[in-house]
């Protein structure tokens, strides 16, 4: 059902695991929620800097950037406490912190018959404190080729199809300067950024 699909896609760790299962690239990181020792192991494997992210987080909250091993313990306790207070879920996972990336999202609309339509991207790279300030469609970035656009749309469609989700959703990606995309989360709701898609497409 869409209720179950929403719960799965709305949990960052489960959405990440689903993406890996169906071949959608994700940012290197932990396989699931970790404790401090688990976080240390992941960092030793993938290197610094990393982000501690709340499993149930959203809206740019619950993200802590770690640049040295010394910061980890203090940040882990803070992040976990904040995640519990904000989202009712203290669990954290680790992802590599990618710098100088574009934040690109693809909105899709799906019906109960398996049809999934993907709109052109929204570029939400202009941010402050991991929160979006300016959204642009189509992306003004010269690296946004038609090939990359089609690839992102295909990934977005594949994710919602994999769980038989029907309704609106937005799949968010980080894209490196060389055009390598990584899925970071799925929002199963009408986002505030929808306005620019509505202006462009009239939906």
Model-predicted regions and their roles:
Residues 1-171, 175-200:
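N-terminal beta-alpha lobe that positions the nucleotide/phosphoryl donor
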Residues 203:
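Catalytic cores of secreted or luminal carbohydrate-active enzymes
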